[in-house]
Amino acid sequence: MCGIAGFYGFEDRPLLKNMSKACLHRGPDGEGYYTNKNVMLASRRLSIIDLSTGDQPIFNEDKSVAIVYNGEIYNFQELRMDLERKGHRFYTNTDTEAIVHSYEEYGAGCLKNFNGMFAFALYDDNKKQLLLARDRCGIKPLYYTILKNNSLLFASEIKSILQHPEVKREVDSDALNHFIRLRYVPGRKTMFKGINKLLPGHYLVASKKNVKIGKYWELDIGIDESIDENSAIAKLRNLMQNAVKMQMISDVPIGSFLSGGLDTSTIVAFASQASDRPLNTFCMGFGESTDEFEYARVIADKFKTNHKELAVKFDLFKEFPKMIWHIDMPKRNLYPYLIYKEVRKHLKVIHSGMGGDELLGGYVHRYAYMDYISSSNGKKNNPEIIYNKIFSKEEYEDKIAKIKKAKSPAEAYSFITSADAGFDAEQLKDIYSEKMKSKISKPVSGEFEEYFRKKGFSAAEQAFYAEFNVKMPNDFLIVEDAMSMANSVEARVPFLDNGLIDFCFSLPARLKVNNGTGKYILRKMMSDVLPKKISRRKKWGFSTTTHSLFKSELRDIAQNMLPDGFLVNKKYINKNFIEKVLKEKAAKSNTQNYNLLWNLVAFEIWHGIYIKPAKFHKPDLSMNSFLK
């Protein structure tokens, strides 16, 4: 695991050093460089496997192929045996070297053979080509930009790319619209105009002639309606067991998050089976009513883990700029940053439960909404069954009213997938200026359209597909990677194993969401392994609400930063709207607006770090430095 950076088409050793230094936190255990007149590569190493000989770059036998790499290929031992039979000679015990020899044998076709998380840059000196590639799901990030002379810069983090003085730091208006509407930026765009993500399951080839991008994998959702429940349980158990066992490979101590929820408890159960010593487990608490210590203890006791309860005390806004600095974009979810900060005090590899919801139907309310709007009588899977225990009648009716106005399933989903059921066109008239409206080139729903064109699938199954391809890689996985690597921790995600993904997307919706119960098949599978209070436990979240935050700190911070901030001064957001929300008495019915204010505060901090300075540099990241 590490951070990578580099460029193709020119030489600049000081720039390469600066790009590497910018992502030092991703790999504090070592650094390595590869340079020639065509390409320059840098690696920061967080040593996990083969601690003695695993330094990068790593080469093939004649050193005509060089690689810098971020991630883990969990099936590398199987790949190595196959390659050795074909005559390849290995000099290390790393998974990195398996990539090099796989490329020699299969070219870019090797990518489909890798089971793991990865982003890498591989230079072939014989072909004078640079190959960039990213894993199927987008677990590991990779960003790039193309300069005027057709040269290419790439890195694990955008701050490394910004070390080049010719890279423009401009806000992308479409990305800003997506961020305001969804809280994340889908697709290839980032908040920086001209700096792109390499999409999951894609590769890029840079040569002296051009830059080409290709897709080596996409999710196939062929549903097997014939599978019965018992067969599905048996297959899922076998795949889960193998996935967790593969992801136990490490030359340093490894642990697992344990919230007491279904996903982490499942991982701990299988990891304990695969380990010859007590597993290290961690449960975090923030002094909230939703702290999960009680549930985690049940699982820790059952599997006799080496369990730690970490009570995190924090000032919510104190760490806010640091979190934004590490993720290179406006975000407001601080919990992962604080969690990984605590984990790093104990170890540097940990299993996360990420992906369980996306594969097995954890977001029940979203799927209920989609089935509701797609049914002819509006009664099928009425989401009120689920939502009336979460929202007031007024909030529920507001959400349904917005969704009913949607012109397409994709537009409805764009409302549903945003945490606040989205802003509709009427609301945006008050929020956006005419300038902002004129700069938006396509609707937010356009990012979801292709996933709802799939014929022969239920609305819920189409939503599963969109969830996996859009929100998971562009929101959850970006946060997971940035916040773990900010603290030099490798987060592994067993649910996002190749075999598990393929199998779970062949399951019919009835085995994922059944009678209002999400992750039905996983609950059934674990019912004879986990205590009932865990296997039947519903999804839980943090209790801090934006409404309570608005009453305490958010109103004052928003008042300080927004009325005279970039978005108002440059006429993206209407000042009257902001002042109206700030003047109104705090009320739960205004939660959607408070969420927006919090997003805008995050944007202003991001802008103050990345766009406003005449020259990009790491600034003072104390919250006071962003307040007037």
Give the residues covered by each predicted segment.
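Phosphate/pyrophosphate-binding loops and the adjoining catalytic core of nucleotide-dependent enzymes
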Residues: 472
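ATP-dependent adenylate-handling active sites, centered on carboxylate activation for C-N bond formation
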Residues: 7-18, 37, 85, 105, ...
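PAPS-dependent sulfotransferase catalytic core
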Residues: 530-588
